[in-house]
């Protein structure tokens, strides 16, 4: 026997409920499925925006008669009568202070005064009223209470996903996203449905409710609108294109630059805004032969008579211009920018391209860009100079074919570094050296007559003797396998297959043109010191120019066996020879697969 909750007398509702507006009365209502506790809220301005029921005030709220259901106003009082006869008309309705909002007559949870004290008002409703209620709800039936997926389900109407303080806004157009208000919070409820999967009992006991179709997408929240965090690039001219005339001028107000601010899109937005730039009739370009050295100046001067009179007060601007014309061009000189018509260029939006200065040395244009990485480090530069001096390529050329580098190397080899320092910066070729005489060297700055005589004598000898015959480079010379094996100190050629690590062996580039093992660090390895690696993984050993190439090969093998063809020096011990023959008889080494370090 369950205890019946406290029931107030009938006159309590009529007297105290209207006088004291802070009283909240909970009343149990009998239903077929389960007892439903209806929370009775008094008529406050916070609720007055939700549901006008009078006919005279329904025109202010378009969502009442609109064909689109407003999910903001759908609540649990759809389960009871919401017809116009259910309005609570009280002749003794107290006057509320004006807050800028019109007052309406609202039902108390949709219960009419004739039925608000009846515990079984569900049974007293007629079929016409239920049909009217269902028709205005625009749902086929009040379903979703028992968790049926095919029916619309009840969603919680809370302050986390909606705001009942916000004004009732009609449904926006489909292409435009809804305007989010700042005081809305994120939807923190992680449940898709409010019904538990294990129980058929609906959870009607927490807060207000609204109808929501399961298959229909809900009102997008702020978290959904801000879900895309990547910056998007959009052109605002597609949204509101700026109309332009045929002359290129922007039609519209010229007082300010109009930039639209759109708040419906995510925060991280990269916008491309069309900015209005007032132009003259033409864009002035300075002709130049160099690519990318065009100076474009967009002027905003108006063709008024006063502009031509202001040419006397001109601005002097220092410009750097590079032209390949035959006419002499003043570089780094103050230049007055003015049009051919005499209009002064006072526009601050002038776009100038980056141009390169003319080099003082003509030959640096070709040599500075190539091999720039080699000139950055001093060690590489000195090594390159030593290699050129050792190779002495100028000796194998005729004087007519010499370049500036060949001339400088010849002077350095002749112990004339002072003369070479004087010639740096001149565009000298071998053809110029054929016309040298004592007077020419004096004009170049060689003041000592003895040095001039010595220089001319060496040059005449080189011209008479001609270029030296080309010699084969010993370092790059290909040595045949016959020449290598013919060495008397080596008498064995072995085929070895073993996995290695980078710490097992130490190699160097030997005199035979291939890598030679200098130290064996690993244990139980078939390799020995002084072994020459003739072939490594079916590649000729002479292709491995340095130990770093073998180290990279060992690292890339990742523990796999590496095949070596080894040229080994003969030994005096017969025991070692027999062990070496046994290891090389099958062509595969008997060493363990994982050498110990």
Swiss-Prot record:
Q: Which domain of life is it from?
A: Eukaryota
Composition bias, Pro residues: 169-178
SUPFAM superfamilies of this UniProt entry?
SAM/Pointed domain
SMART domains of this UniProt entry? SAM (SM00454)
Domain SAM span(s) in chain numbering: 402-465
- Entry-linked Gene3D superfamilies: Transcription Factor, Ets-1
Ranges of compositional bias, category Low complexity: 293-313, 581-597
Give the region (Disordered) as residue ranges. Answer: 165-197, 278-344, 576-597
What is this protein called in UniProt? Uncharacterized protein C05D10.4
- The annotated regions of Basic and acidic residues compositional bias extend over 179-189
Task: Give the species this sequence originates from.
Answer: Caenorhabditis elegans
Q: Mind giving the lineage of the organism this protein is from?
A: Eukaryota, Metazoa, Ecdysozoa, Nematoda, Chromadorea
User: What Pfam family is a match for this entry?
Assistant: SAM_2
């Amino acid at each position: 026997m369950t205890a019946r909750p406290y029931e107030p007398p009938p006159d309590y509702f009529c007297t105290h409920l209207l006088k004291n507006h802070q009283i909240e009365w909970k009343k149990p209502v009998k239903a077929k499925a389960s007892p439903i506790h209806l929370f009775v809220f008094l008529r406050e301005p916070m609720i007055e925006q939700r549901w006008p029921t009078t006919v005279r005030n329904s025109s202010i709220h378009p969502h009442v008669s609109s064909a689109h259901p407003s999910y903001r106003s759908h609540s649990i009082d759809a389960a009871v009568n919401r017809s116009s006869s259910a309005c609570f008309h009280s002749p003794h309705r107290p006057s509320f202070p004006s807050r800028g909002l019109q007052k309406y007559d609202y039902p108390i949870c949709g219960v009419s005064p004739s039925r608000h004290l009846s515990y079984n008002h569900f049974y007293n409703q007629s079929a016409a009223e239920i049909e009217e209620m269902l028709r205005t709800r625009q749902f086929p039936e009040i379903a979703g209470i028992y968790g049926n997926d095919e029916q619309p389900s009840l969603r919680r109407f809370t302050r986390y996903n909606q705001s009942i303080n916000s004004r009732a806004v009609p449904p926006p157009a489909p292409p435009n996203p809804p305007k989010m208000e700042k005081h809305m919070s994120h939807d923190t409820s992680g449940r898709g449905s409010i019904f538990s999967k294990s129980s058929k009992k609906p959870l009607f006991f927490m807060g207000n409710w609204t109808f929501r179709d399961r298959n229909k997408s809900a009102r997008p929240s702020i978290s959904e609108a801000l879900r895309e965090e990547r910056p998007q690039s959009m052109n605002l001219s597609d949204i509101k294109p700026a109309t332009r005339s045929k002359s290129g001028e922007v039609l519209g107000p010229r007082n300010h630059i109009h930039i639209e601010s759109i708040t419906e899109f995510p925060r991280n937005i990269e916008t491309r805004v069309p900015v209005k730039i007032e132009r003259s009739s033409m864009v002035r370009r300075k002709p130049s032969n160099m690519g990318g050295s065009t100076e474009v100046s967009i002027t905003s001067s108006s063709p008024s008579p006063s502009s031509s009179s202001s040419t006397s007060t001109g601005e002097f601007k220092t410009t750097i211009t590079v032209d390949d014309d035959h006419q002499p061009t003043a570089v780094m000189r103050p230049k007055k920018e003015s049009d051919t018509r005499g209009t002064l260029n006072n526009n601050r939006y002038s776009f100038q391209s980056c141009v390169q200065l003319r080099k003082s040395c003509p030959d640096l244009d070709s040599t500075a860009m190539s091999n720039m990485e080699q000139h950055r480090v001093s060690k590489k530069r000195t090594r390159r100079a030593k290699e050129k001096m050792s190779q002495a390529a100028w000796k194998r050329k005729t004087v007519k074919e010499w370049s500036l580098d060949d001339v400088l190397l010849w002077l350095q080899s002749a112990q004339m570094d002072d003369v070479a320092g004087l010639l740096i910066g001149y565009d000298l070729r071998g053809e110029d050296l054929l016309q040298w005489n004592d007077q020419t060297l004096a004009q170049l700055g060689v003041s000592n007559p003895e040095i001039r005589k010595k220089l001319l004598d060496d040059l005449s000898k080189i011209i008479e003797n001609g270029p030296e015959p080309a010699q084969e480079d010993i370092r790059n010379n290909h040595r045949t396998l016959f020449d290598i094996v013919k060495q008397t100190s080596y008498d064995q050629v072995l085929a070895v297959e073993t996995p290695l690590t980078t710490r097992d062996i130490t190699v160097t580039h030997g005199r035979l043109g291939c890598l030679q093992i200098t130290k064996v660090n690993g244990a139980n390895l078939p390799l020995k010191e002084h072994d020459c690696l003739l072939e490594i993984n079916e590649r000729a050993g002479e292709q491995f120019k340095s130990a770093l190439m073998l180290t990279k090969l060992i690292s890339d093998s990742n523990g796999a066996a590496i095949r070596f063809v080894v040229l080994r020096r003969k030994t005096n011990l017969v025991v070692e020879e027999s062990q070496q023959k046994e290891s090389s008889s099958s062509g595969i080494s008997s060493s363990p697969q994982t050498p110990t370090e």
